Structure formats: C-alpha cells, structure tokens
Amino acid sequence: MAKAKFERTKPHVNIGTIGHVDHGKTTLTAAISKVLHDKYPDLNPFTPFDEIDKAPEEKQRGITINIAHVEYQTEKRHYAHVDAPGHADYIKNMITGAAQMDGAILVVAATDGPMAQTREHVLLARQVGVPYLLVALNKSDMVDDEEILELVEMEVRELLSSQGFDGDDAPVIRVSGLKALEGDPEWVKTVEELMDAVDESVPEPVRDMDKPFLMPIEDVFTITGRGTVVTGKVERGKLAINSEVEIVGIRPAQKTTVTGIEMFHKQMDEAWAGENCGLLLRGTKREDVERGQVVVKPGTNTPHTQFEAQVYILSKAEGGRDNPFYSNYRPQFYFRTTDVTGVITLPEGTQMVMPGDNTEMTVDLIQPIAMEEGLGFAIREGGRTIGSGKVTKILA
C-alpha cells in the first residue's frame, strides 16, 4: 500500500464539482474520497455519499446555502472540495462564495452531453473568476460507442472555449463515479487519473500571505500621548512595523507610517493575514480616517465608484424583498465593513429583477470604495440583506 507522509508544507488548493443536476457530481465527489482513502489510508478518511448529499446549511453574507465540504489529500497536495447539491445552492455559492475555487471539475454525463445548467455553470465560473476548469466525463461505463464519447468530448471542449477557458488543452477524463465507488478496478483507475490531472493542471494559488497587504478598518480610536489606532482583521499580506501604508476609499487617499502593531494588547513586529490587530498611525488625526476605508501597501489598491457585478437576489422565503426592483433602484452596498449607497442599472433586455433571481448589473456608488475584481459585497435595504454579489468588472 502506497504510504504518503502527512506534510503541513503541502500546498492547499480549493476545488469543487460543478455541472448539470443528476450528472453525478456528488457520486463523483464520494468516489474521489473513497479512491484516495484506499490509496492513502493514513491521509484520508472516507466521506460517504449520503454525508455529502445531505449537505449542511451554512450562512454566507446572510444567505443560507446547502453545501458540503470534503477534505482529502493526494501525494502532492491538500484539497478542500465543495459540492453544492442543488442548482440554486450552486449558484448562490458561486456568487456569494466564501469558498472561492482555485479550480473546478466540470462533471458532464457521457450519456447526455452538456445541458442547460452545464452551460450556466461554466458561464458563472468564468464571471466569478474560477481560474481553471477540467472535465470529468462521468457515466462513461454506460456508453459503448467510442464515437459518441468523442462527440460529447468535442462538445464540452467547444463549450469551454466559448466561455474563455482552455477548451483545446483542458484534461477530459472518462470516469464512472458509481463504478469507482463500488470498487471496480478499471474505473478506480480513472478516478486516480482524474486526481493526477487535478494535481498537474490546476495552478497553485497565490497564498493570502504572499499578496500585497490589505486591512479593512473596523474601528478608529485615539490613544492619549501615542496617536490614532485603526483596528481590523488583516485580509491579506503581511506588514512590518515602520512600513509606509496608504489609506484608501471614501475620501482622498493618504499615506502614513505604521509606528506600532498591537494584537491582544501585546506589541508585535508584524501583522499577518488572518490576524485581528491595531495599527498605530504616525501623524494621523482621529477625524482623518473612518470605518470602511482600507489600509494597504502603497499603490496596490485604488478606489472605484462604477462596476459590473453578478448578483443573487434573495427570495421572499429567504428574508428578501417581496417585490421586484427595476433600474435606478438605490439600495446600500456593503463592502467589507461599510455600507455605501449605489444606483443600479439592469442589463439591456432585463426589465426587472424578481426575488430569487440571479442577474448581472452595473452599479454607480455615491462614494469611492477600495475594490478589485472578484470582491464580494452584500446588498442591503434598511439594514437587512436582500442580495449578494461579486464585482466582475471595474468601469470607473
């Protein structure tokens, strides 16, 4: 039995299964878990189908989503795999997703070929910035005709290319999740091949720690005799004491130097991604900064007011609006730590948006906010969440 030793130094990669309902996403997820468990028992517990299928509910930015998280390891990597059973859950996770995927396995049943939701999922993956797709041609055990398999593969490749993915070179692996789950050696091998392809082809993500420093400001206060302190959770990067920073968003950008870093009342030399800390700012007055701005490495982030977004609007049952809205609707957009009013323009041909819909839109904010493509936000009305979205393109 091949034994891989557990190393914390392994790269961590977030992936997921996407594709049309009933094409076998959850069965394949369970099969991956089982095949890797059998291959590396020390590294992987087996997560059975029914555990993934009854995906637990979780809340992301006020929206309830049923989603299953499965962890497993290959020899090279540690994976966190998300599987959203329902089509609506999948869409909600893509748009609001805390689980940002570094790559996804597009599951297409060889018996059906690409269907409506296959197309919708690929389009959405492109819009929300999933960087890489590869294909599992599932249920291949049920198709005897090689020509049909080749046709389906061609169709899937064309679909990927049409949405800006690498349709020519993306790995397309013929698998049978069900047969692999039953332990059929021929089909177990195909799932091993699929995971080798995931290892080789899904690019390793840049870790949060290696990105330029960014901390959203949650609170501002004055320490007598020392100056102004801003607190928040470091979103990415790291910052050493005496570094120059820029404060961006809402008002004109200003530069200052961080003369002290404090965490849980202890002095620190550095602030790292994921940590809650206070930054002491040289020569900055209490009234110069406010919640909703961000502290960044100079020159790495600019404030914007106009952007395109992909948005999910809550249904009435989820606590959303009870009626549709139209262009020129002016709700609040909650970015990181603050609400800013924005004016919505719906795409041509869309008259109105109903609760429960997902849509594209253009937004004009009344104040500039530090943002980049892929940034998530909530849409709020009178303090309650009515929608959630991601910035897909910055316009101004």
Swiss-Prot record:
One of its GO terms (cellular component) is cytosol. Mg(2+) binds at residue 26. Its main location: cytoplasm. Residues 83-86 are annotated as: G3. Residues 176-178 are annotated as: G5. GTP binds at residues 19-26, 83-87, 138-141. It is found in: Cytoplasm. Residues 138-141 are annotated as: G4. Keywords: Cytoplasm, Elongation factor, GTP-binding, Hydrolase, Magnesium, Metal-binding, Nucleotide-binding, Protein biosynthesis. Residues 10-206 form the tr-type G domain. It is an enzyme of class 3 (hydrolase). It catalyses: GTP + H2O = GDP + phosphate + H(+). Pfam families: GTP_EFTU, GTP_EFTU_D2, GTP_EFTU_D3. GO terms for molecular function: GTP binding; GTPase activity; translation elongation factor activity. The keyword Metal-binding applies. InterPro entries: EF-Tu_GTP-bd (IPR041709), EF-Tu_GTPase (IPR050055), EFTu-like_2 (IPR004161), EFTU_2 (IPR033720), G_TR_CS (IPR031157), P-loop_NTPase (IPR027417), Small_GTP-bd (IPR005225), T_Tr_GTP-bd_dom (IPR000795). Residues 62-66 are annotated as: G2. SUPFAM superfamilies: EF-Tu/eEF-1alpha/eIF2-gamma C-terminal domain (SSF50465), P-loop containing nucleoside triphosphate hydrolases (SSF52540), Translation proteins (SSF50447). GTP hydrolase that promotes the GTP-dependent binding of aminoacyl-tRNA to the A-site of ribosomes during protein biosynthesis. Belongs to the TRAFAC class translation factor GTPase superfamily. Classic translation factor GTPase family. EF-Tu/EF-1A subfamily. Monomer. This is Elongation factor Tu. It comes from Beutenbergia cavernae (strain ATCC BAA-8 / DSM 12333 / CCUG 43141 / JCM 11478 / NBRC 16432 / NCIMB 13614 / HKI 0122). The gene is tuf.
